[in-house]
Amino acid sequence: MEAISETRTTIERGQIAQKLESGYRVCPFVGSYVTAPIPALFGVAYDVGENVYFFYFDDGKGAILAAFD
């Protein structure tokens, strides 16, 4: 089992870069990467270009929490 300190992440803000069958790729406002496809919580649908709050772990897992203006 991983130690809690090894599994921490932060809530980030970003923009939907791509919509795929396997989830959404998000480009964070801070940083120079694009996430692997991650799901949206509660099955909410988003459009490319929408601003979202999300979390993303180093192992490529994460989720989109909500959209914002």
Where do the model's predicted regions map?
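Exposed beta-strand/loop interface patches that mediate assembly or binding
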Residues: 1-69
